[in-house]
Amino acid sequence: MSKFTSRELRARRHRRLRGQLSGTPERPRLNVFRSGLNIYAQVIDDLAGHTLVSASTIDTELRGSLGEQRKLEQAHSVGKAVAERARAAGITKVVFDRGGYKYHGRVKAVAEGAREGGLEF
């Protein structure tokens, strides 16, 4: 039996990744967080410590269009939305931060949606 829960292991992976990843004003960090029900994506400038743009499944703008979509499809829509907002803010290149999650499922769907929306990783 493992000494750590899966949540603790994810947090450890995320801390390890954050030591290697850093968002700059020229190439900010696209961070993904997923809960059991929702998914969140933020574009962050780590040097200034500011969130530049964000999108999530709880946004009022997206909530109506998500409707009866499955969580995987919702994640794809969130990726597209964050990419559109980033491009409107003049951001075209980002560093992808998977947040310690496996690059699979909803995290992968956010990344693919962001790529479709025009962001370069």
Curated annotation (Swiss-Prot):
Record GO terms (molecular function): 5S rRNA binding; structural constituent of ribosome
Pfam families: Ribosomal_L18p (PF00861)
Gene3D superfamilies linked to this entry: 3.30.420.100
Transmembrane segments: none
Keyword Ribonucleoprotein belongs to the record: yes
GO biological process, one term: translation
Ribonucleoprotein is among the record's keywords: yes
CDD domains recorded: Ribosomal_L18_L5e
Stretches of the chain forming a coiled coil according to its record: none
Keywords of the record: Ribonucleoprotein, Ribosomal protein, RNA-binding, rRNA-binding
GO cellular component, one term: cytosolic large ribosomal subunit
Function noted in UniProt: This is one of the proteins that bind and probably mediate the attachment of the 5S RNA into the large ribosomal subunit, where it forms part of the central protuberance.
Family as reported in the entry's similarity comment: Belongs to the universal ribosomal protein uL18 family.
PANTHER family: 39S RIBOSOMAL PROTEIN L18, MITOCHONDRIAL (PTHR12899), LARGE RIBOSOMAL SUBUNIT PROTEIN UL18M (PTHR12899:SF3)
UniProt subunit comment: Part of the 50S ribosomal subunit; part of the 5S rRNA/L5/L18/L25 subcomplex. Contacts the 5S and 23S rRNAs.
Protein name: Large ribosomal subunit protein uL18
Source species taxonomy: Bacteria, Bacillati, Chloroflexota, Chloroflexia, Herpetosiphonales
